[in-house]
Amino acid sequence: MQNFEDLFTYQDGIFLTWMWNTLFYGIVGTAGMTLISVACGYGLAMYSFRGRGFLMGCIIGSFLVPGALLTIPSFLLYTDLRLIDTPTAIIVPSFFNAFSVYLAKVYAEGAIPHELLEAARIDGAGEYRIFFQVGVRLMSTGAATIFLLGFVGMWNSFFGPLVFLRSSEKWTVMLGLYSWLTVKHDQTVDLTGMVVVGSIISLIPMVVLMVSMQRFWRTGVSLGSLK
């Protein structure tokens, strides 16, 4: 119990700040990534246009580029834009995820019949209305999966915050707990015990998210059986 008390009081309760930061980065960044990925995947799956195959090849090819390879160019760019040590440096890059776009495209191809879109067009619906009222609803299970994978990635992010964030008040929970492990022995508290307790507490949002997403997957299975 002493570790729990120390965890929430050490350094003026900075652990709660790290938890809030990570939750904020995760929700905002993953929500933007999900919307962009679903829109791009829907467009690639439902529309035929010149260069679609080349564009899809570029998306798949980007899987081969190590994220660490882009660290220095990204750092220089963010420095020029004065984004270092700001939430923007963590949130905006998470909006664009090639794997999520690919996943959304594959799911849209199997979940959305072209005949349904044609029927909506005949009824006078515009493309934006079709996307939000038809496409998004039919892709809800895929969107939930993309959101879950993205949020878990953001929650466990370490390298990006380590490079782009300097102020400890803006760190994520993973980076903050790691910093406690690298601190010299503190005679007042048991930092190792606090890290263990903090790691356990940091799992709670993941469990809550997993449970809350169950209804989307159940809905997807039901729709699939009805088809």
Model-identified regions with their sequence ranges:
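A structural signal for multi-pass alpha-helical bundles of membrane permease subunits
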Residues: 1-227
